[in-house]
Amino acid sequence: MAQLLSDVEIQSQASKLSGWTLEGSKLQTTRKFKDFIEAIAFVNKLVEPAESAGHHPDIEISYNKVKVTLTTHDAGGLTQKDFDVAATISQIN
């Protein structure tokens, strides 16, 4: 099981990510697209990196908006995996 990060580690990692916010024990970003088709295309681009990492985000789709939430459920909070996947997602257009 992945090890939980300390509050100091979480703040340090979060400061390196643009467009992500800490919401309790979760890391979140919301992306806005031109339309539903572009939003779904973005979600489809998340499949490969999530599968490769063995770490899957929670995803909410609302027409042209996609909210991505990361947390390590089995550890009960944020781990390095969450920040690694967030960094990868940040590079996806």
Curated annotation (Swiss-Prot):
Record's catalysed reaction(s): (4aS,6R)-4a-hydroxy-L-erythro-5,6,7,8-tetrahydrobiopterin = (6R)-L-erythro-6,7-dihydrobiopterin + H2O
Alphabetical GO biological process terms: tetrahydrobiopterin biosynthetic process
Entry EC no(s): 4.2.1.96
Pfam family, one: Pterin_4a
Entry-linked InterPro entries: PCD_sf, Pterin_deHydtase
Gene Ontology MF term list: 4-alpha-hydroxytetrahydrobiopterin dehydratase activity
Keywords: Lyase
Broad class of enzyme this protein falls into: lyase
NCBIfam families: PRK00823.1-2 (NF002017)
PANTHER family registered for this protein in UniProt: PTERIN-4-ALPHA-CARBINOLAMINE DEHYDRATASE (PTHR12599:SF0)
Family label: Belongs to the pterin-4-alpha-carbinolamine dehydratase family.
UniProt protein name: Putative pterin-4-alpha-carbinolamine dehydratase
